Amino acid sequence: MKKKYFGTDGIRGKVGASLITPEFTLKLGWAAGRVLAKSGSKKVLIGKDPRISGYMLEAALEAGLAAAGLRPVLMGPMPTPAVAYLTQTFRATAGIVISASHNPYYDNGIKFFSDQGTKLSEEIELEIEAEIDKELKCVDSSELGKAYRIEDAAGRYIEFCKSTFPSKYNLNGLKVVVDCANGATYHIAPLVISELGADVIAMGVEPDGLNINLNCGATSMQAISERVVKENADFGIAFDGDGDRVMMVDHTGYVLDGDELLYIIARDKLRSGTLKGGAVGTKMSNLGLEQSLKTLGIPFERSDVGDRHVMELMIKNNWCIGAENSGHIICSDHLSTGDGIVSGLQVISAMQSSRMKLYELRQGIKKYPQILLNLGFDNKIDPLQDNDVLAEAKRIETLLGDKGRVLLRKSGTEPVFRIMVEADESEKVVRGYAKSIADKVKV
């Protein structure tokens, strides 16, 4: 059955329009409460990123959950993976995150975690949708839920993050630039890195509700790249607005994406004998990653785009690492969802164990030039059904043979058509291939 409200990563949209309104959010909280109340604890944890609309949506969710008889547990600004982790440690029935991740402040979203810290199954999402369409009826007054706040949630999560970094290593003597995107990691990531011994230069740690992801963080790496070089830092680490993505910068200012970080983690696990099976990427992962891993003898498989699909393939194969090139990296031996801080620490651990700089570790992977074009399109004409678009893509695929790839897909969260072309050619040539397909799209 097709979902009516939930997208690929919860419910997301522009605040005040679509579904991101106080009215709908209250109804969503009630509907989710009705479904979740059927099992286990009545506690539901709520975390959010610092964008201004989060306060409004948090209040609406709190009211809806309480009306269904559940106890909302408020944690304030908290990274998405922290909510996943704390949902398990508090034995809550679910966790809810109010965030639009890497999107601008005027968007927001709501996503859920199960009591095991995993994304809700599509079956549960469909159950919640069925309840949304019913009339809201409060439980009896004696059964109403009562909200309370956890004051030490950040401290608990900081200790968890540090526990994933081998105790035999420290960051003494290292200068590290940390960019928190004015998002949910602003009060956590700098402390994690500094408590491990590094001299931290913090950026993006002054959220005002409107500046989340604004020219900073994992989706805008120019500022941290320049800062690392200016400060003569050893490396930089950047997160997105909700803290589930990570990108890194070596001492030269070069930006390492999720593909390169996955390679470094996989290689380190292979060397230490802790690699279980292989590594999972997505259809967007660079062909160079696949070939570099195979050179090491590490199996590699691709899932559909989205961390949910990455995790599903990891579970199917019984593998412990997977990533998207956007910086969602899952290390399931630590947590069952993408965690920017924890994943970054695994890369830093690889630096420590190999006694190599980030610059040296990235030399093992040769990436092909990859061009990604994002196009708005006319909703009346599906580009994936447009014969002109498909014919041009097929022509280029035939031309490239096994030396490159073409991938066409629509975004699951916004009306955007994505064209990806990569090949063992110059960037100029690859861009030309992508543009020739884009020229066929009716916008």
Curated annotation (Swiss-Prot):
Name by which UniProt lists this protein: Phosphoglucosamine mutase
Modification sites for Phosphoserine: S101
Active-site residues from the entry: S101 (phosphoserine intermediate)
Enzyme class: isomerase
Cofactor or coenzyme needed: Mg(2+)
UniProt entry tagged with the keyword Phosphoprotein: yes
Protein's organism: Psychromonas ingrahamii (strain DSM 17664 / CCUG 51855 / 37)
GO cellular component terms, semicolon-separated: cytosol
GO molecular function: magnesium ion binding; phosphoglucosamine mutase activity; phosphomannomutase activity
Example GO biological process: carbohydrate metabolic process
Similarity field: Belongs to the phosphohexose mutase family.
Keywords: Isomerase, Magnesium, Metal-binding, Phosphoprotein
Co-factor: note: Binds 1 Mg(2+) ion per subunit.
The record's account of how the chain is modified after translation: Activated by phosphorylation.
Family matches, as Pfam families: PGM_PMM_I, PGM_PMM_II, PGM_PMM_III, PGM_PMM_IV
Enzyme Commission number(s) from the entry: 5.4.2.10
Function of the protein: Catalyzes the conversion of glucosamine-6-phosphate to glucosamine-1-phosphate.
Catalytic activity: alpha-D-glucosamine 1-phosphate = D-glucosamine 6-phosphate
PANTHER family noted in UniProt: PHOSPHOGLUCOMUTASE (ALPHA-D-GLUCOSE-1,6-BISPHOSPHATE-DEPENDENT), PHOSPHOHEXOSE MUTASE
PROSITE patterns: PGM_PMM
